[in-house]
Amino acid sequence: MKYDLVIAGGGTAGCACAYISGKLGLKTLLIEKNSFLGGTMTSALVTPAMKTSENNINTDFFNDLMNNLHEIGGQITYADGNKGWFNPELLKITLDKMMISANVEVLFNTKISEIITEPYLNKENKNALNSNSIQNEKYIKKIKLSNYNDTICDDNINHKQNKLLEYIETRYLVDGTGNAKIFEKLNCEFLNKIEKEKISEKNIFQPMNLRFIMSGINLKEFSKWITELDKDRNVTTSYIIEGQTHLSTAYTWDNNKDWALRPVFKAGIEEGLITEEDSNYFQVFTIPQMHSSLAFNCPRLISDTDINPEDTIQTSKLLMSARASIQRLSVFLRKFFKGFEHAYISSIANELGIRVSNRIKGKYVYTIDDLKSGKKFKNPCLVSNYPVDIHSKEKNKSTLEHQMQEYSLPIESLQSCNYKNLFAIGRCISADFEAQGALRIIPSCFSMGEGLAKYLAQQGD
């Protein structure tokens, strides 16, 4: 089998890339480890999408997605103009529909098990194997797939039982795994590993969250209570949208604001219902077509040291700790929040919400100076004004730095510096730690995937 484009990871950026490449006529294969698409939006319950610049580019996928969701009641536009409020369950259905409409082939429960590479030779340098300009650059020739749910990693067993095990040729391979698993498999360079070696005390990760949903909430009563308690409309807002109550509120343990919810959380801590760590970050949003539910962007999981999202031992402990925290929060909320008297936990995310993990070293390393200066590029894939948003495990150390001007990201920050036809999209792009803190949001990941698809569609054979 031959494809123009194979995308590993049917998440935020991967779905955008697949949909647009399919619409542009590229033969596209999208492979996904789960049994549904959406990545962090569905498996980690990351909803809503944050608002970004109205001047953003490569927004066809975002607009089509939200329009399709709205048709089945799975999307609303919030009062601030943010169209990115969505229902994560209906998103799964909508993404299936969109991939079919774009003629994208999708394989669930699948992974890439083998990658065949060769030295890169174009028409001008076929006889120049020893040329300094190309001697370190390679080319992805073909890949082999296998079932992601295999629990015994034995090639002999796989070859007998798995019909997926055949080589697939592709012009381009795109890593949309979030953790740059394809780059890792190919032993590519990573900025986070380089930075760690240079500055041992430097933060290279951010705390993770385990999101959850509570249902059975009287949203009208909660809305009345929270808007009377908190008059800061930069923190707490509530509106009737399409006949339903929609709202958002927040609290952190930082002292940068006179948080209205601080006395409430303090009382919960004093009663022993929650710990101080449980209260370090709290944020809630309503969900379209889930009229008695709230999505929680918490608990934020902190520890004495940075935890690498790739560390299975540490993240396993973190998941169990997080679920215990969710249980404590639910008891606290039922006692102290009006409208929560009969509320219950209805969903806990299948995966941790990861803000940053592996970051590739690409053709161009995008820096915080590029972002702050609004540096222009020949091949931008997005335009944003979202702030540099870096969460800390320490009190009063998180930053939310708004930018005075818009910034853009070049396609070259998505391209491998080692392989001619290998790209990464999503949170694992080639950007330094601070810049990545602004680029990781859903709309920007959509634009990365779409921008790359359009760029590749314009390239020759």
Where is each model-derived feature located?
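Beta1/beta-strand and adjacent pyrophosphate-binding region of the FAD-binding site
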Residues: 1-11
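Membrane-embedded transmembrane-helix bundle of lipid-linked glycan/lipid transferases
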Residues: 6-8, 22, 170
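N-terminal Rossmann-fold NAD(P) dinucleotide-binding loop
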Residues: 14
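SH3/SH3-like beta-barrel fold
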Residues: 143-145
